[in-house]
């Protein structure tokens, strides 16, 4: 009996020792990952500060998506050409577009705030549209613009959706119209993501958007994550923290996984995590930690 007790005691000591030896390594791994994420966030804040300085300190109007839009759907007989042609920037003018500058116009956000900005000519807007090709299409026929009028369009910005002045271009052979925000493309901050490194890819959870509380002291990040919480196999819970500067905020989202082994699906779901700020968000921009790009922020309902 004593022998059995001694064996059991030795086994228990070995188990405890094994668990103890794993603990520091696991803790160190998490600490290293946290330090890496904070370093990545600091680098994103530094790149944003440089971009704002290059833009003359302006970060009121920061689009978070392209400034080219489309009104209507392509007809069946032209869609196979026109959609890739637009993505390739193959748009030319079939008539002389005005190159004179229209009067200043107003950007209006959904929260009621406004900003008066200088606008660009129709000819310049078309040049800007062509200068942003997404993919080449050597076999496509160019779209031909046969008219332009100053209108408005909705654009996603770092402060949420905004209605902005826009040139609306009519096209030959289709009822579809193109829109281009009538504000110079280079007037706001333009930040480039860090170069891709296959041996050291960016860490963290990519943020799609965020909502803020009325007092601006909390940000809720919206992102794609595990469908279930950590109480289920393959599930994850998420926490968030904010790394702040005078110009921007980076949200770090940390996943807390269920360690139970099992087969997991690749299906994602919309998840959220909330971070508290040291001071109200104000006019600061919220950045994604993966690439340091601005994300749209709206007032929480």
Locate predicted features.
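Long, terminal "pre-/pro-" and other extracytoplasmic accessory regions
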Residues: 2-243, 248-272, 276, 285-301
């Amino acid at each position: 009996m004593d022998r059995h007790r001694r064996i059991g005691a030795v086994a228990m000591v070995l188990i405890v020792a094994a668990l103890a030896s794993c603990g520091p390594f696991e803790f160190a791994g998490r600490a290293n990952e946290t330090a890496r994420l904070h370093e990545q966030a600091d680098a994103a804040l530094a790149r944003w500060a440089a971009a704002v300085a290059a833009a003359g300190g302006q970060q009121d109007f920061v689009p978070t998506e392209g400034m080219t839009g489309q009104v209507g759907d392509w007809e069946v007989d032209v869609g196979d050409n026109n959609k890739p042609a637009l993505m390739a920037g193959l748009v030319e003018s079939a008539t002389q577009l005005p190159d004179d500058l229209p009067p200043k116009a107003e950007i209006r956000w959904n929260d009621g705030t406004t900003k008066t900005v200088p606008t660009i000519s129709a000819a310049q807007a078309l040049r800007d549209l062509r200068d942003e090709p997404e993919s080449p299409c050597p076999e496509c026929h160019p779209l031909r613009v046969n008219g332009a009028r100053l209108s408005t369009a909705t654009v996603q910005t770092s402060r949420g959706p905004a209605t902005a002045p826009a040139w609306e271009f009519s096209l030959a052979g289709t009822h579809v119209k193109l829109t281009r925000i009538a504000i110079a493309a280079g007037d706001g901050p333009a930040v480039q993501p860090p170069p891709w490194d296959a041996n050291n890819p960016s860490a963290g959870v990519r943020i799609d958007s965020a909502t803020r509380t009325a007092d601006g002291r909390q940000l809720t990040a919206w992102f794609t994550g595990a469908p279930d919480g950590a109480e289920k196999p393959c599930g994850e819970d998420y926490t968030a923290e904010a790394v702040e500067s005078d110009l921007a905020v980076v949200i770090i989202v940390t996943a807390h996984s269920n360690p139970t082994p099992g087969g997991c699906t690749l299906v994602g779901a919309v998840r959220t995590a909330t971070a508290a700020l040291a001071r109200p968000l104000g006019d600061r921009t919220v950045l994604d930690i993966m690439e340091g790009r601005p994300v749209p922020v709206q007032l929480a309902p």
